Amino acid sequence: MSGNNIKVVCRFRPQNSLEIREGGTPIIDIDPEGTQLELKGKEFKGNFNFDKVFGMNTAQKDVFDYSIKTIVDDVTAGYNGTVFAYGQTGSGKTFTMMGADIDDEKTKGIIPRIVEQIFDSIMASPSNLEFTVKVSYMEIYMEKVRDLLNPSSENLPIHEDKTKGVYVKGLLEVYVGSTDEVYEVMRRGSNNRVVAYTNMNAESSRSHSIVMFTITQKNVDTGAAKSGKLYLVDLAGSEKVGKTGASGQTLEEAKKINKSLTALGMVINALTDGKSSHVPYRDSKLTRILQESLGGNSRTTLIINCSPSSYNEAETLSTLRFGARAKSIKNKAKVNADLSPAELKALLKKVKSEAVTYQTYIAALEGEVNVWRTGGTVPEGKWVTMDKVSKGDFAGLPPAPGFKSPVSDEGSRPATPVPTLEKDEREEFIKRENELMDQISEKETELTNREKLLESLREEMGYYKEQEQSVTKENQQMTSELSELRLQLQKVSYESKENAITVDSLKEANQDLMAELEELKKNLSEMRQAHKDATDSDKEKRKAEKMAQMMSGFDPSGILNDKERQIRNALSKLDGEQQQTLTVEDLVSLRRELAESKMLVEQHTKTISDLSADKDAMEAKKIELEGRLGALEKEYEELLDKTIAEEEANMQNADVDNLSALKTKLEAQYAEKKEVQQKEIDDLKRELDRKQSGHEKLSAAMTDLRAANDQLQAALSEQPFQAPQDNSDMTEKEKDIERTRKSMAQQLADFEVMKKALMRDLQNRCEKVVELEMSLDETREQYNNVLRASNNKAQQKKMAFLERNLEQLTNVQKQLVEQNASLKKEVALAERKLIARNERIQSLETLLHNAQDKLLNQNKKFEQQLATVRERLEQARSQKSQNSLAALNFSRIAKPLRGNGAAIDNGSDDGSLPTSPTDKRDKRSSWMPGFMNSR
């Protein structure tokens, strides 16, 4: 090292793709000796001197061998050491400290090489030296100290005392026994470190990381101990926001990083300017932790990482100036040694001897002073001096009271014998200690098993607690649902009571209305019966007139009577001339009359067919009239409902008499309608009578015709035969006449039957037609009445108003009586509702009181559960911390190491180091033999 100053090493990395893309070119020139560089920038041109300058293609091993190797040796010898890596973001600090791959011999960084160097130095040390190595890993993120080996420990405090100096309280320190264990610690810690992407670096460190190695050295023979701390600091890079593109959380991190680096620069300025009386270590947690490394008890190496490109000229110049200032810092490094028991005893003996000498000197001086005070004199040769006291020349000194010779004191009691142990006794002590260590290992194994069992029991208890919580939660849900259902049930019961009261009141009102309705129905039926009796006679008369008028149009009695007379004359003629012989002309005339009679019968048959067709037409007309009647009745009902609705709408604010007036008006309209219908029925009856008389006339004509036909047939049968010459012809003619007579008689009989049937059917159809016409006329009259009534609403309203005024005086008393009765009913109803509501209020108050009690109990339970949850949370946190330590596979038990391949248990000859704390706990060598030897 160059004196006791900080060693500053400068390292340049090659240009990256961003710098090449932006047109950057190298602007540095390193001299052949590697201690000076020239910066050829646009803003600044000049030289910088450092302890060593490494170019862009320098290997990791070369940087380590020159810069760091000696510091590791000093730390193992008991000195404190610090290695800084400083530079802008993306300048290669993390690559220098950690490397690309800690398992690659070429690219692994300074920290892996330091780890290997530490254990190599331990292995190369004498066998009587025992070493323990502890590792801790922390980061300073957003000005908060965070333990990377125990991420749950955040914002750790920084303390200071006389023995420890500045330290981080609560920082986890792990004992390690091999490089693999250190690498595992480094991997675990690096995984917890905060990194982020920026435009300058894809994995930019967002915090300062510090790896601290504590190496303790003990001489097992003498008991002397030394300890050294090695700080490996990877600083986060200084950032220019314009280049990194930081924003949001990354921007806040950049602010904190630049703040701590500024505080570091202020500390260096205060240490180097020679004028500052105060060094601002407390301005940043970084400078506070590294207080001993900057101007204190430490041997420090600062590695400044720079970019050679003109693209980052300003950042490179700032970094070089920082390193140049730091180079002038002077540290005061010393060995951190603990005195051995022998050295402490010698020091104690020396101090005791000096104390006795001073006491003797004080006593001699007091004696000389007493002589002078008594007026005596002391010769100059007997004056008290320190040299005489030191030499033990007490004869020439004046006597002093209380003075005792130290020699007599020394001989007054024998010295305590110092026991000396033989080699076999020392081996026995070591063997006993190893046995105790084995027992400790067994106890630790048993403790581990017990902890596992306890953990399983805790998990089981946690499971049961979760089950209990789920059951409790379900119970609470069911309880709440039950409470809600109870409330709903009570609400329903209360509503049912109110509904029952309302139903009772409605029943009473319904009974009153039913009684009134029965009375109205009775009055209406009486009025209908009276009106019906009055209109039945008129309707029958009208119906008879219409039937007579209708049947008169179908009276064929004249024609039938003429033909009947002709047929009867022919038959009479036949009867009168039975004894005479008929001539040919008579027979021809008779046949002609028979043919005419047959034609007349056919004509009447056709007439009957026409009547049948008319009957069918009347049936169709009947159906049509029935449809029209239904439509008119429907329209009448709709119009009536509309009229009633309008009347009710207009009567909302009127008196109750309006309803009576409307009922009276409707009854009058109904009576008028019944009267009109009765008149139409009477007309139809009269028409039916007329048709019946016509039918009787037709039947009489048919009877006459049949009689004439019979007479004619008889006359023909009584006609005598002609001469013998015409006998055959007459016989044939008689047969024809007989057939004709029979045919006419049969036709007359059929005609009579048909006439009767037709007349019955015609009479029935006429009755139906008359009834339909009467109904149609009645409906038309009702429709016209409704139209007239709707057109005269104003007059009807006036009449109703007058009627209401007339009836108002008579109904006042009735209204008052009804109002009084209704008020009494309402009072009773209100009293019942009030009683029900009071019961409801009392039940609700009881439920409220119960709910408050339950709420208090639930609050107490909740507080208890909250306390339990907090306890479990604390247990979980502690368990998490323990799990993180268990994940590292390490323990807090020290792992002593010895050099020259000496086995720690004094029983193995292979110099292998422990690789894991599970490989039979490392036995610590005893310090007792050395203590005994020092005695």
From Swiss-Prot:
Q: Which Gene3D superfamilies match?
A: Kinesin motor domain (3.40.850.10)
| Positions that bind ATP | 87-94, 237-244
Q: Which residues form a coiled coil?
A: 342-887
As for subcellular location, the record says: Cytoplasm, Cytoskeleton
Question: Which residue intervals make up region (Disordered)?
Answer: 400-419, 898-935
Major location (coarse): cytoplasm
Q: Give the top-rank taxon of the lineage listed in the UniProt record for this protein.
A: Eukaryota
Q: What InterPro entries does the record tag this protein with?
A: Kinesin-like_fam, Kinesin_motor_CS, Kinesin_motor_dom, Kinesin_motor_dom_sf, P-loop_NTPase
* Keyword terms, alphabetized: ATP-binding, Coiled coil, Cytoplasm, Cytoskeleton, Microtubule, Motor protein, Nucleotide-binding
Q: What function is annotated for this protein?
A: Kinesin is a microtubule-associated force-producing protein that may play a role in organelle transport. Its motor activity is directed toward the microtubule's plus end. The speed of this motor is 4-5 times faster than its animal counterparts.
Q: What domain comment accompanies this record?
A: Composed of three structural domains: a large globular N-terminal domain which is responsible for the motor activity of kinesin (it hydrolyzes ATP and binds microtubule), a central alpha-helical coiled coil domain that mediates the heavy chain dimerization; and a small globular C-terminal domain which interacts with other proteins (such as the kinesin light chains), vesicles and membranous organelles.
Family of this protein: Belongs to the TRAFAC class myosin-kinesin ATPase superfamily. Kinesin family. Kinesin subfamily.
Name of the protein this chain belongs to: Kinesin heavy chain
